Regions:
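Extended, folded cores of ATP/NTP-driven motor/assembly subunits in large transport
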Residues: 1-402
Length: 402
């Protein structure tokens, strides 16, 4: 069956459904059901103008907008996790080649042809494309009751997911400044998964899409049975898929914090043909669990300070910072904020003809240069790759009985 996903590793339990017609264009959004984790997810392709030329006040506003997005997701009491995925893919020049072939003039000057060809060749090797995805994950346990009130079954769950999509999209387009938010259909999601496993296949797919505009009989879609790799091998230090190797590492936020945009060096490839990708996940802790954790942390901080005073010991700076953080967390929860414990995973992908160990060391160096501490996901490289490269809502913190 070409509609059944054939994906390796942790993605084996994923099933893709076509949701009911949605929006003004009546698109059938792809609904991702993970039978192993018992979750539902939807993925959107987004476009953001970036913050490279923004001043401090503008960046602070974007930070507040992200916090507002997490608060909105937490108040729904349904969204379990929000994942932001970015992939910087080497430019293959497929769109430019198609445009040049359509607009080429037979009487063009020969020198102009040579200059443009040389410029295209040089700029293509030095350019990258950025793909950004946002995925919201909803556990079955949180949506089952409300889905029953909305009609029950698969359609009831889709109605609840569509309501959540509307709330999240309003935050993305408004305070966060996204210029485009497009919820992916099943063929579009299959294309994103296929180019995640094999970045080199994109040029052929783009050409097929161009030919389909002239000849509707051309099949430019990627079946889900072919969206995964033809072969995958999870070794100790890297992950092999088709003719590509990948190395994944988690990143830990330093105690002193970092400036917004500090992840940029991680996304900068060091050589032509190298792809970088990372995902920043925001698992949202339920309000009751957050209150319990905050109360325990504040009680532990008060107990530690009391013991130090009774024994005549001096409270260290690290202990004072942790106590201040615990009390500040309780105050923020009392004001209605949500508690999240974000984490990030970054991945580098290169062809098998290039040494993956060398590019893994370069990835670690980029992480340290950005101000973070890298931790290789040895023995779990396949999970790290799926979480940071394939936009299907794979998480590193969610258990199978969630």
């Amino acid at each position: 069956d070409l509609d059944t996903p054939d994906l390796p590793g942790v993605l084996q339990g994923v099933q893709i459904h076509d949701g009911p017609p949605h929006g003004s264009q009546l698109q059938r959004v792809a609904i991702i059901e993970d039978h192993a984790m018992k979750t539902w997810a939807v993925t959107a392709s987004v476009v953001h103008p970036g913050i490279g030329m923004k001043d401090t006040a503008e960046r602070a506003r974007y930070g507040e907008a992200l916090a507002g997005l997490l608060d909105v997701a937490g108040r729904t009491e349904k969204v379990d996790e929000i994942l932001f995925m970015v992939r910087t893919v080497p430019e293959d020049g497929a769109e430019r080649d198609l445009w040049v072939n359509r607009h080429r003039r037979p009487n063009a000057p020969e020198l102009s042809e040579v200059v443009n060809s040389d410029l295209a060749h040089g700029l293509t090797q030095a350019s990258v494309r950025t793909e950004t995805f946002v995925t919201i994950v909803v556990p079955e346990t949180r949506i089952a009751r409300s889905a029953k009130e909305s009609g029950g079954g698969f359609e009831g769950r889709c109605r609840e997911l569509y309501l959540l999509m509307g709330e999240i999209e309003a935050q993305l387009r408004g305070p966060m400044g996204m210029t485009q938010v497009r919820w992916l259909t099943s063929p579009e999601l299959a294309l994103a998964c296929r180019t995640g496993f094999a970045p080199g296949d994109r040029a052929g797919i783009v050409e097929a899409l161009s030919l389909r505009e002239k000849d509707p009989s051309v099949n430019a879609d990627v079946p889900w049975a072919m969206a995964g790799p033809s072969g995958a091998d999870a070794t100790v230090r890297h992950y092999s898929h088709d003719a590509w190797n990948s190395v994944s590492a988690t990143i830990k936020l330093p105690t002193r914090g970092v400036a917004m945009g500090a992840l940029a060096p991680i996304l900068t490839p060091s050589e032509f043909g190298e792809r970088r990708s990372f995902v920043v996940a925001y698992p949202i802790v339920s309000q009751s669990k957050a209150d319990r954790q905050s109360g325990n942390a504040e009680w532990a901080a008060d107990l530690a300070e009391g013991m130090n005073e009774k024994l005549g010991r001096k409270t260290r700076a690290k202990q004072r910072d942790e106590a201040h953080k615990a009390r500040g967390l309780d105050a923020k929860l009392a004001r209605g904020n949500s508690l999240t414990r974000p984490y990030g995973v970054c991945t580098v992908t290169v062809p098998t003809s290039m040494r993956i160990t060398e590019f893994g060391r370069r990835l670690d160096a980029s992480v340290r240069r950005a101000g973070f501490a890298p931790l290789r996901l040895d023995l779990a490289q396949d999970v790290g790759f799926a979480a940071s490269t394939i936009p299907l809502g794979t998480s590193l913190t969610r258990s199978g009985d969630a």
